[in-house]
Amino acid sequence: MQAETLEELHTSLPEMHSVTSLAVPEEQWQRVNTPEDRLSAERKLDRWLVKPTDGIYARLNRRISIPISRQLIKFPITPNMVSIFTLGVGVASAAFFAYGGYWSTLLGAFLCLCASILDGSDGEVARLKLQESDFGCWLETICDYAFYLFLLVGMTIGQWRTSGTSTYLVYGGLLLFGALASFLALGWERRRLASGRPEQLLKIWQTHAESRPSNPFLYFGRRLEFIVRRCFFPYALLVFALFNLMNVAFVLSVIGANLVWPIALYSSRAFARPRSQDVENRAAAREYAAGLL
């Protein structure tokens, strides 16, 4: 009997001996027959875009970035284009910070928050268009680092111009040192802990840190790691800028930047498997494969 509807086809396929059917989990597919089914499928995709490692501020950003991404996928826009555009918004934010003054700093903080929201759109567009790639992940990382460098330089210049004292230039040097050291340490950590899956670094790090609750260094890092996330930082800057407390935010940034890289270096050495163990594992795998031949 010839199937005339999708429902009949779905029912008759398992009865055909020439076709193998596999059960697919409900959350991985959606049959769309009506406009209501389409809305249900879109909501399922929205939930799929939320990462397990997303914190409160990241989920708040998703409420804005996901609708934006849904509009972007209607056009020939690639995830890498979104990453570069987001960096441009970040550079504009840094320029307003560098100009100094209350309103300019407040506008810079607002643009910083906009860049943070758009920072989620490149990954969302990549997933919705099935265009995820290692290059895209690394480009996003480079754009994130460049954004931070521009932002920190802008904050340093702005505080120096506003205060008229060279002390902030010294603080700015310490801030840039901490930021660069943190970028290098995190890059090394990403290579050691998440080689081949760089987007999983945070999840891997959290899993390792939570498995050692008695380690005070890791406990401290795990409880405060949300502070250095890009999603939290812009909200904090906006609050400090709103109350004209950017000098406090600047000093806290100097301290935070010089706490990240020691924790990253320590955890990358503590969590990474010894090289000798990797060699032994590869040798055992070769011996096992040779025994099968």
Regions found by a protein language model. Give the residues of each.
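A feature for the membrane-embedded catalytic helix bundles of lipid/isoprenoid biosynthetic enzymes
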Residues: 4-5, 9-13, 17-66, 142-293
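Glycine-rich adenosyl-nucleotide cofactor-binding module
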Residues: 48-88, 103
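Short amphipathic alpha-helical coupling elements at transmembrane boundaries
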Residues: 66-74, 123, 127, 137, ...
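Alpha-helical transmembrane segments of multipass membrane proteins
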Residues: 71, 91-95, 235-239
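Membrane-interface starts of transmembrane alpha-helices
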Residues: 78, 82, 103-104, 136, ...
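Membrane-embedded alpha-helical segments that form the functional core of polytopic membrane enzymes
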Residues: 79-135
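Hydrophobic core positions of alpha-helical segments in small-molecule transporters
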Residues: 85, 107, 111, 139, ...
